[in-house]
A protein has these predicted regions:
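Catalytic-core region of carbohydrate-active enzymes that cleave or remodel glycosidic bonds
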Residues: 28, 146-197
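Aromatic-lined carbohydrate-binding surfaces of glycoside hydrolases
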Residues: 1-122, 126, 131-144
């Protein structure tokens, strides 16, 4: 999916960011009462890199980079610094969570590291969360504010895990939108029953 934040690489090599589409979507959801958490995806997206309009050439470019690489960290920090200022201006910082699709332990750790390196005006960092489809991330579950575990990879202790996380103010959900599971046209209630024994 294309990013709701439009990136432009200026002639001096720095990036600028246009949040118009993101703001519209967030405000539309808030208008309809969907306002507990803003989940921002794509900083560790499937395209492995950054898509931007190059001001010098007028073309759209893709710069390949993966979490943990120095260039990825540099660009991510530049983006997060600007994003955090924008979120503070809109009053959305405290309800925003950087999200990832299913990623490895090293990729997730890289995102946590870069997210913790960029602070807002009060010294706080953005929350981080993501979809989990294996127990590989278990050692860092407590560093993730919000995890959504794929139904097919639920640990045996899911109830205890969810309760422990809840006591720490962390969020745990289950997702069933994977191979052989609920499709978009299905009644949403069907997903709830799919995880019961």
């Amino acid at each position: 999916f294309p990013s709701m934040v439009k990136w432009t690489r200026k002639k001096d090599g720095k990036f600028s960011f246009d949040y118009t589409d993101m703001d519209y979507w967030v405000e539309l959801n808030m208008k309809h009462g969907i306002n507990r958490q803003i989940n921002l995806h794509s900083i560790a997206g499937f395209a492995w890199g950054f898509v931007y309009k190059d001001e010098a050439s007028g073309t759209v470019k893709h710069e390949g980079s993966v979490p943990g690489e120095p260039r990825w960290e540099q660009i991510s920090r530049e983006f997060l610094t600007d994003l955090i200022a924008h979120l503070e201006e809109k009053g959305w910082f405290d309800i925003t969570c950087l999200q990832m699709d299913e990623r490895t332990l090293s990729q997730t750790s890289a995102l946590i590291k870069v997210a913790k390196s960029v602070k807002n005006s009060e010294g706080k960092t953005l929350k981080v969360g993501g979809a989990v489809n294996s127990t590989e991330l278990a050692p860092i579950f407590d560093e993730l504010h919000d995890i959504s575990i794929w139904e097919n990879s639920l640990p045996d202790n899911i109830k205890e895990l969810a309760e422990q996380r809840r006591e720490k103010g962390l969020r745990t959900t289950i997702y069933s939108c994977g191979a052989g599971k609920m499709a978009t046209p299905c009644n949403p209630g069907e997903a709830a029953y799919a995880v019961y024994d």
